[in-house]
Amino acid sequence: MATTQASEAATEKGLPLGMDVSMVDEYASQSKLLQEFVKIPTIGNAWIFNSKTENTSRAIVSVGQTDLLANKKRSFLLNSHISKNSSNSVDFQWSPFPIEMSGVSAVIPSPSGRKLLLIRNSEDDSPTKLEVWGPCQLENEIHIAQSVHGSLYVDEWFEGISWNQEETLVAYVAEEPPQPKPEFNDSGYKKAGSSEKDCKSWKGKGDWEETWGETYSKKRIPALFVVNISSGEVRAVKGIPRTLSVGQVIWAPSSSHSLVFVAWSSDNGYQKTPRKLGIKYCFNRPCALYAVPDPFMEEADKPSLNVSKGETAPTTKLTSELSSAFFPRFSPDGKYLVFISAKSAIDSGTHNATNSMHKIDWPADGKLEGLSVADVVPIVMCPQDGCFPGLYCSGILRNPWLTDGQTMILSSIWGSKEVILSVNVVSREVSRVSPQDSDYSWNVLALDKDNILAVSSSLITVPQIYYGSEVCQTGKPNQWEWQEIATPFPSPSDKISAILADHKFSILKIPISNSSNKLADGAKLPFEAIFVSWKDSATRPTIVVLHGGPHTVYPSSYSKSLAFLYSQGYNLLVVNYRGSLGFGEEALQSLPGNIGSQDVNDVLTALDFVIKKGLIDASKVAVVGGSHGGFLTTHLIGQAPGTFVAAAARNPVCNLSLMVGTTDIPEWCFVEIYGKEGKNCFSEYPSFDDLCQFHQKSPISHISKVSTPTLFLLGAQDLRVPVSNGLQYARTLKEMGVETKIIVFPEDMHGLDKPQSDFESFLNIGVWFKKHMSK
């Protein structure tokens, strides 16, 4: 009732719908401060190229900036000349101004750095444009009609734009051209092949085709193409079954005249399903590596990629013995094909899990019969204290190799931190390259021969670029030294800098509260929580922050949104409960079958931990989370009534029995409720007992106990947790008389990541918490 009365009062005063009259000034001041956070640029990709002089090189860094007025993210390229001297110090000489990439969907420098490919995808039926730039001019502009293919895939999953070594051809993944639709006119159905133009004819819809779900609702079939950058000729790669969706294409060594790519089956591989299941954030979709001939090679010159005689399709499956293979990379000498596998996620059904790394010895003659897969980095089940917890890899550089041709540099998760690792694919040695004693997160941006360009940040400390060099020590393991690089990026305003400077940052080890003999050893280990606090934290209000997934992690890297909430005077307790990435496979697999209980208990245990240590005021605690974090948020206000003064949920999972029939990942409901057995009992038609279990473990089963004022932020285009889930729960709270506020973003999907939506979301969270924490 309080929200309704406030809205009526606001309407009478001519204020926006839903505006609380008492919070108008707070709304204005917080929005002004949040805009200052939005102005801080983000660091994207980077590329480094060798120069003719031995101790110099060239760098390109992509920088992003939010344009709230246009509701989009703008991108820029910044160039730098790198000079190294004998004392291992390095100097970056940046260009005075960045170059804006307006209308550019992707930027792909050639391996030598002498050419630059710009992709301009069209938002309508106009041709896709590929621009090939040389040192001083536009060398070619290629227009590709929709009849050839649709937009190129530039996302982090299917994307695979790849130059060949000679820099004459580019392979890429694009939307398959649209299939013919039935056409009708005054005489009824218009038969195919008719060349008559009839202004009275119209096209029907034809058969419906499944998509890959969340964020891919307008995409159907990713297909493989190669373009000659000189002639502009585009050829589709033949021989790939239409049931395979392709991505992550790379060129094999030149002698092979072939391409290697990842493919996902539309029936979910060996886990046969009648549909495509959502693939965004889902590493548990079976996939494999394939090889196919370069379509520009003459038939007589093509090597035989067939596994056996009589096989007509040129596509060869390279990883038949594994259920998952992605992120393929060839070693510089072409001897090894190295890749990542999420076979643990496939086997268990969880949407993400501990990765493994493997390699294939690539045959010099290009004959691919009888290839075997060797392990490089195995799955870590239960890490020893302080030791490597396993590989958690969300991407790999296009060129991740040091000059020895055997060592890869990549980013991974280690507990609550992102770290940089070196992996020797021959010796199988894994080492941590980023500072051992740092709780900050580190990510690799690019390699400069045997040196590393990286970015480091903490939850509320803006990213800073570093340059790392390996230092040899006699009789001791080599160490990496890191030099902070001055950049022309604008610093946060004096006001923000002053606020953020006054903080404490730590990663807490939280002992579990309910250890039992049934738990695997890894599940008995402490989990972690990131605690960002003011010096007088015990008198300040605190926000508990919960990640989604549940098999993701909230790393210690910079978050604009959390830095903004901290600036409002809150401590932040970010809980990486058991089931999160970065703590070994046994801890992760302890959660499926126990959601709504184990994860809820871990959050309450972490909260109790900081309360008992006198770090926070127990009477001033709020909670916020999205997706599975929203599941936990709504569970907590029901299972622990009176604990939280206020709550905010972004696209929360509130009722699994409703979600299972509407989400793009219905099998998630079965796996997280039943554990590993859920993978086998998944059905598009849940039984009565299934629906009862789903309801029993859902937050809505505890809703009668809720009294916490709750804010809901929902995306109307969400296919992962459809808007009906949050609306049902929120409407029930309103029916019960609990103070509730709902904001629906009509054009947003699950991430609520359109700039204006993200801004309005966290502005309202800040104001909502201020209103209820100030009472």
Swiss-Prot record:
<dbReference type="InterPro" id="IPR011659">
    <property type="entry name" value="PD40"/>
</dbReference>
<feature type="active site" description="Charge relay system">
    <location>
        <position position="718"/>
    </location>
</feature>
<dbReference type="GO" id="GO:0005737">
    <property type="term" value="C:cytoplasm"/>
</dbReference>
<keyword id="KW-0378">Hydrolase</keyword>
<comment type="function">
    <text>Catalyzes the hydrolysis of the N-terminal peptide bond of an N-acetylated peptide to generate an N-acetylated amino acid and a peptide with a free N-terminus.</text>
</comment>
<comment type="subunit">
    <text>Homotetramer.</text>
</comment>
<dbReference type="InterPro" id="IPR045550">
    <property type="entry name" value="AARE_N"/>
</dbReference>
<dbReference type="Pfam" id="PF00326">
    <property type="entry name" value="Peptidase_S9"/>
</dbReference>
<dbReference type="GO" id="GO:0008242">
    <property type="term" value="F:omega peptidase activity"/>
</dbReference>
<dbReference type="GO" id="GO:0004252">
    <property type="term" value="F:serine-type endopeptidase activity"/>
</dbReference>
<keyword id="KW-0963">Cytoplasm</keyword>
<dbReference type="InterPro" id="IPR001375">
    <property type="entry name" value="Peptidase_S9_cat"/>
</dbReference>
<dbReference type="Pfam" id="PF07676">
    <property type="entry name" value="PD40"/>
</dbReference>
<comment type="similarity">
    <text>Belongs to the peptidase S9C family.</text>
</comment>
<feature type="active site" description="Charge relay system">
    <location>
        <position position="627"/>
    </location>
</feature>
<dbReference type="InterPro" id="IPR002471">
    <property type="entry name" value="Pept_S9_AS"/>
</dbReference>
<dbReference type="InterPro" id="IPR029058">
    <property type="entry name" value="AB_hydrolase_fold"/>
</dbReference>
<dbReference type="GO" id="GO:0006508">
    <property type="term" value="P:proteolysis"/>
</dbReference>
<dbReference type="Pfam" id="PF19283">
    <property type="entry name" value="APEH_N"/>
</dbReference>
<feature type="active site" description="Charge relay system">
    <location>
        <position position="750"/>
    </location>
</feature>
<protein>
    <recommendedName>
        <fullName>Acylamino-acid-releasing enzyme 1</fullName>
        <ecNumber>3.4.19.1</ecNumber>
    </recommendedName>
</protein>
